[in-house]
Each structure stands twice: as structure tokens, then as C-alpha cells.
């Protein structure tokens, strides 16, 4: 199981994956697979973040063995222990999650690992740096409330200098190296793991140098256009494959070469591919449906039970209090299961983002001052809300924020 300091743990798992790649020791892979399953299925946030606890104890369960219990710090918690306001989720731990999954992808070629790389990169890694690149988060909580009656260990506003200054350079390094995660190569094959406008110049063993150009507005749109720009003379008689990852969030995709449809029964977390003798100027179009989805959590995740998160493509969305009409509180907003969101481009801090606008329900209640419980207020009214990408929160001044919102069924 995944346990202990989340940054050190994730870097350790990445290192063990490197050892397995060199030695092929099967017990290492067995352990890594078990740890990965524990993280992804029981301990990872929807943003790809890791390390729920700032301080805690381990092991922590129903048994009582005081001599075996130790204090843990900035660590993984119990299975399904995923608090929002107190979530630690150090940026370095989220980067470590990327590094671990990247190595598992290189070893196995399984698209499910690329899915985690993308989820963490677009959400809990990019959230660690402001849109202007000048301010940082050490921790990445999923909720900010103005009413907490206690002080959190780390400030929940972006700052230019962090006393524990590991996350800022680590984030910048990761962003600068993101191109290295876009493609992987195999025998006469190119795998597209991450999508974004770019040019790939590489060499395929037994074939020679090739150049591919990718054109797309991803992650805002699901259409990817790949152009074969240059090929070696030897390739005129040799076929090779181009693979496109079908993400977990995509139910339907189409693949065409020079306008001709390519048949295939592709599934989530798999690769679609075309194998052929290519020509310079060939155009491949890979179009993924990108619906707005409402996600719910496992019922054992008590802090987020009966709540939903909004996701479109790889982007997790959040609600800031400034984006609720009438200046209402995030606590009062509920998301109907039949809500219709409209994607719209806007700028935040000079950066283009895709926001989602829709009509939610508002349960406008009186102040909770001096109360812990009270009778349910059944009165609700519609309210216009705007959701922004989670990575972009905290760039417009201080506000409340939440990723998970109560669901109205």
C-alpha cells in the first residue's frame, strides 16, 4: 500500500520502477502494481494530487496497537480519506505521481498510466504556479472557506516566496520538460500520449528520421490534426504505426487518414492506431468527443459523499465565490444532475481558458452563527454560475473556492 511522506514515497516508487526496468525483477513490478492500484483507486484526488494529510498517524484503523503507531507528516492517509479544506497535496507529491506513472507507461505501454500523467499535469501540477508564472502554491486543497475556525499550516493564497522552496523550481522544471511526455517510441511506432500543438523530430529504429506536426486547441477542444512532414527515403517501402491515446473521459472518437475513415472499436484507456506506408503530406485527424461530465466519488470517501465534480476533457473545474451571481456563498450552491453547461473562452490574468457557465440551484440559508444543526430549508432558486479550470483558481484575488459541490438529484 501507499503510505508515508507522499513526496518521498512517489519518488521512491519512480525509482523502484527504474530498477525494475533495468533488472526485470518480477516482485518489484508486483509491488508497484499493488501500490499504484491503492493510490489511484483509494487515495488519489480527482485532480491527480496525492498526500491528503499534513499530520497524521500510521497505521490508523480500527485495531489498537499503540506501540506500532507513528506520526506521519505530509503523507498518504487511510483509504478513501480525502478531505478538501485540509488537503495537503504538496505540488512536489503531485509531480512525483507524474514521474511514477510515466515510468510505468514506459515499462508497460499501458495507456492508463498516461491518463494519470495528464490528469496530474493539467490540474494539480499547473495549480502550483500562477498564470503569470510569478507566484506559487505549496499545497493544493480542493476547497477554501472563509469560515474555518482554525489556521491552516500553509497559506491558501499564491505567494512569491515559499519558505520550503522545493515546489517552485520543481514545477518549472516539470512544465519545461512536459514535451518529453508527449510521445513514446517503439519498434516502427510512434505513440501520442499527450496532445498539444507541436512538432516531433525523431528517429525510428530501422527506418530513419521522421517529422510529424500536431495541430490542436487541446485541452479545450478534442480535435487533433497530425501532419506527416518529412520521411526518410527508406520509408517509402516500410510501414510504421501512429498510435493515438483514447482518454478515460472519452466515450467516442473518430480517426481518418486523408479524409478516409479508419474503422476500429476503440475503448477508453487504450490506443487507436493506423499502420501503413506513409507519404509526406499525409494528414491524420483524431477527433475525441469532449462532453461535460459530472463525477461522483466512492461512498466510503465521506468528505465528498453526495457531491459532484465537473470535468471536461482532462480539465477539472472549480467554483470561486466571485463567479456566483449576486455574490452568494459557495456553501449554498447545488449542482442539478441535469445541469447544462456552456463552454466559453475567457481570459484570466491574461491567459486564455475555457470556462463553463450554467444554471445551478441556490439554497440561500441564514447564517450558521451559533448553530451546529438546524432544520432543512427546502426553498431553492436558480442561480447563474461560472466554473473555471482548477489550475487557474486564486489568480483573481482572494476568494472562496470549491471543486466538489453538493448534488441535487
Predicted regions and their residues:
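Beta-strand-rich binding/interaction modules
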Residues: 237-258
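Active-site lining segments of carbohydrate-active enzymes
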Residues: 1-27, 31-42
Amino acid at each position: 500500500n501507499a503510505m508515508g511522506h507522499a513526496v518521498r514515497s512517489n519518488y521512491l516508487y519512480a525509482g523502484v520502477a527504474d530498477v525494475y526496468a533495468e533488472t526485470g525483477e518480477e516482485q518489484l513490478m508486483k509491488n508497484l502494481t499493488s501500490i499504484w492500484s491503492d493510490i489511484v483507486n483509494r487515495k488519489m484526488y480527482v485532480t491527480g494530487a496525492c498526500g491528503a494529510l499534513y499530520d497524521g498517524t500510521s497505521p490508523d484503523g480500527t485495531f489498537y496497537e499503540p506501540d506500532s503507531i507513528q506520526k506521519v507528516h505530509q503523507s498518504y492517509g487511510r483509504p478513501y480519506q480525502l478531505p478538501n479544506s485540509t488537503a495537503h497535496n504538496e505540488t512536489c507529491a503531485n509531480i512525483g505521481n507524474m514521474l511514477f506513472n510515466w515510468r510505468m507507461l514506459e515499462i508497460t505501454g499501458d495507456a492508463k498510466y498516461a491518463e494519470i500523467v495528464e490528469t496530474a499535469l493539467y490540474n494539480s501540477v499547473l495549480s502550483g504556479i500562477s498564470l503569470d508564472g510569478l507566484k506559487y502554491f505549496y499545497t493544493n486543497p480542493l476547497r477554501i472557506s472563509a469560515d474555518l475556525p482554525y489556521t491552516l499550516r500553509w497559506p491558501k493564497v499564491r505567494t512569491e516566496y515559499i519558505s520550503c522552496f522545493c515546489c517552485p523550481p520543481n514545477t518549472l522544471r516539470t512544465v519545461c520538460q512536459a514535451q518529453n511526455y508527449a510521445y513514446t517510441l517503439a519498434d516502427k511506432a510512434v505513440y501520442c500520449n499527450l496532445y498539444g500543438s507541436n512538432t516531433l523530430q525523431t528517429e525510428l529504429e530501422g527506418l530513419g528520421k521522421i517529422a510529424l506536426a500536431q495541430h490542436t486547441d487541446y485541452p479545450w477542444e478534442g480535435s487533433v490534426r497530425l501532419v506527416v512532414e518529412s520521411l526518410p527515403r527508406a520509408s517509402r517501402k516500410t510501414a510504421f504505426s501512429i498510435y493515438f491515446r483514447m482518454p478515460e473521459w472519452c466515450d467516442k472518437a473518430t480517426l481518418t487518414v486523408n479524409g478516409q475513415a479508419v474503422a476500429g472499436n476503440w475503448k477508453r484507456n487504450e490506443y487507436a492506431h493506423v499502420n501503413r506506408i506513409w507519404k509526406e503530406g499525409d494528414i491524420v485527424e483524431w477527433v475525441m468527443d469532449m462532453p461535460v461530465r459530472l463525477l461522483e466519488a466512492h461512498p466510503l470517501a465521506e468528505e465528498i459523499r453526495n457531491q459532484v465534480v465537473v470535468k471536461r476533457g482532462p480539465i477539472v473545474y472549480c467554483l470561486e465565490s466571485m463567479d456566483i451571481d449576486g455574490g452568494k456563498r459557495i456553501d449554498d450552491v447545488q449542482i442539478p444532475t441535469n445541469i447544462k453547461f456552456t463552454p466559453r473562452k475567457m481570459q484570466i490574468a491574461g491567459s486564455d481558458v475555457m470556462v463553463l457557465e450554467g444554471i445551478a440551484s441556490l439554497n440561500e440559508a441564514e447564517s450558521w452563527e451559533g448553530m451546529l444543526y438546524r432544520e432543512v430549508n427546502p426553498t431553492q432558486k436558480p442561480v447563474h454560475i461560472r466554473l473555471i479550470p482548477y489550475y487557474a483558481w486564486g489568480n483573481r484575488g482572494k476568494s472562496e473556492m470549491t471543486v466538489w459541490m453538493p448534488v441535487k438529484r
